[in-house]
Design a protein with these regions (language model features):
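The feature captures the beta-strand-to-loop junction immediately N-terminal to the Walker
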Residues: 72-74
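Helix-to-loop junction immediately C-terminal to a conserved catalytic motif
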Residues: 87
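Conserved ABC transporter NBD signature motif
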Residues: 97-111
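Short coil-to-helix segment of the ABC ATPase nucleotide-binding domain corresponding to the Q-loop/switch region
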Residues: 129-138
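Conserved ABC ATPase signature
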Residues: 173-177, 181
Length: 304
């Protein structure tokens, strides 16, 4: 749609280690009506001394509800590549996808889209800005600044800081925060835009177990109060079953869909349910697929 992906340095950028905000070439709404479709996605990379390497092989997916969708697969299988395509983030100098298409609300997504915001494991908060300024950062950008009256965006920022429990730290530098608090800032900065699609690339992967659990519960709460379509990449099978309405497992390269199933248990999911036959069977189902593809390719995580 001709929009810009921007990082926290306000440069036009598609660096996949930063959070990609988008500029509003068209009006973003808070409606839960959303359609995200991937049609026969193929991704190949050229090799200097041989044939191309195919990393994604004909993947088709459809999302049309404000649900949490967990994406798992062996390390290096193409999960992040697929997620970035959904957000319109393209690697420099590479056609992506090689073939196939991504559609948001029926329109081809060939660049960063108004309705999609990304959050990465590296939260990319600026240490020279306060917590408040980091969350408000999108509204410093020209188009967002013109779109929202100052009183409106300030209220959004205040409300989001309260929602993530950082009101009392809004005047601190992000350098003074813990890893979990910084990830709260990154999540708040994404949600302050009220996106209809939130794309999360292992956002809690670097956190300690207690902080990760706190962030998982926070995400559940925020999704309940502000529903949106979430696609969440993780290596943690337990996390997938705790958060997901749908679990999608990719094979090793070239990646195909190895499994795709829904979880009907309501959130928050109790410890009793997590030990139930239903949950254990799902866990074994996912692990059997991952172990089949993951020998020697990386670490699977099951938290207890």
């Amino acid at each position: 749609m001709g929009n810009l992906a921007v990082n926290m340095d306000t440069k036009t950028d598609t660096n996949t280690d930063t959070m990609a905000d988008t500029s509003p070439a068209s009006t973003m709404t808070t409606s839960t009506d959303i359609s995200l479709q991937l049609n026969e996605i193929v991704q190949e990379y050229a090799n200097a001394d041989g044939p191309v390497t195919r990393v994604i092989d004909g993947i088709s997916l459809s999302f049309d509800k404000p649900t949490i969708n967990m994406l798992l697969g062996p390390s290096g299988c193409g999960k992040s590549t697929l997620l970035h395509m959904m957000g319109g983030v393209r690697p420099f100098g590479v056609q992506s996808p090689t073939s196939g298409s991504v559609h948001i609300n029926g329109e081809v997504c060939d660049g960063p889209h108004d309705d999609a915001v990304m959050v990465f494991q590296r939260y990319a908060n600026r240490p020279d800005l306060t917590v408040y300024e980091n969350v408000a950062f999108p509204f410093r950008l020209g188009l967002w600044k013109k779109k929202f009256p100052e009183a409106e965006w300030k209220k959004r920022v205040d409300d989001m800081l309260e929602a993530v429990g950082l009101t009392d730290k809004k005047n601190l530098s992000s350098a003074q925060l813990s890893g979990g608090q910084n990830q709260r800032v990154a999540l708040a900065r994404a949600l302050v835009l009220r996106p209809r699609i939130l794309l999360m690339d292992e956002p809690f992967g670097a956190l300690d177990a207690q902080t990760r659990e706190e962030m998982q519960q926070l995400l559940i709460t925020l999704h309940k109060t502000s529903p949106c379509l979430i696609v969440f990449v993780t290596h943690d099978v337990t996390e997938a079953l705790l958060l997901g309405d749908r679990v999608i497992v990719l094979s090793t390269q070239p990646a195909k869909i190895a499994d795709d199933f829904e979880i009907t248990e309501s959130r928050p999911r109790s410890a009793v349910w997590q030990r139930s036959t239903e949950a254990v069977t799902m866990q074994e189902r996912v692990l059997s697929q991952l172990h089949k593809f993951s020998a020697g390719r990386g670490t699977l995580r099951v938290t207890i």
